[in-house]
Regions:
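N-terminal beta-strand/beta-hairpin edge segment
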Residues: 2-128, 136-139
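Outer-membrane beta-barrel proteins
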Residues: 140-144
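Catalytic-site microenvironment of enzymes
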Residues: 131
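Solvent-exposed beta-strand/coil patches in large extracellular/periplasmic or lumenal scaffold regions
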Residues: 146-165
């Protein structure tokens, strides 16, 4: 199921600014669902192979077990870039977020100060991606705070890896 209250395109002739108001996606069979006040998909007309996704400060996620999650953030964006050739091969994808909080209808909560996740095609090696992650100040749910060597928070996580597909 996919529903929305409005779809609007603005910004032309310099940009394509697609705003989807009150999107609601759900799979009644599996029980998964997602909704938000809006989603924006943005691109420059002179660079349509680079698309930006802007997400709202609050989103709702429904899980198959009946649990409802609220994802809050002060900033949450993603972008994907393709090579500007007729085949549009993948170039890079980035997800950036700040002030993230995930709370559950079952009473748990976790937070994340910042996150940057990236994947980039390695042009010198076929079927190879370079992956990166920078995560700062992860606060885990109270139920996990007493796990040895974990504690109530992770101060930082950094990943720089190459993956051959």
């Amino acid at each position: 199921m996919a529903e929305t209250s409005d779809i609007n395109v603005a910004g032309f002739a310099d940009r394509f600014d697609l705003t989807i108001t009150e999107p609601h996606l759900a799979d009644p069979v599996s029980g998964w669902g997602w909704q938000a006040p809006f989603v924006q998909i943005l691109a420059m007309t002179w660079k349509p192979w680079h698309v930006i996704l802007a997400l709202p400060p609050n989103q709702e996620i429904h899980l198959p077990d009946g649990q409802d999650l609220t994802l809050s953030s002060t900033r949450l964006m993603a972008s994907v870039s393709m090579q500007p050739t007729p085949a549009l091969p993948f170039k890079r994808a980035v997800l950036e977020g700040e002030g993230l909080s995930l709370s559950s209808s079952q009473g748990w909560r976790m937070g994340l100060d910042k996150v940057v996740l990236a994947a980039q095609s390695v042009t010198t090696q076929a079927n190879t991606l370079r992956l990166g992650a920078d995560v700062g100040a992860l606060t885990v749910p109270q139920a996990y705070a007493n796990i040895p060597n974990l504690g109530p928070a992770l101060t930082a996580l950094h990943l720089d890896a190459s993956v051959i597909l």
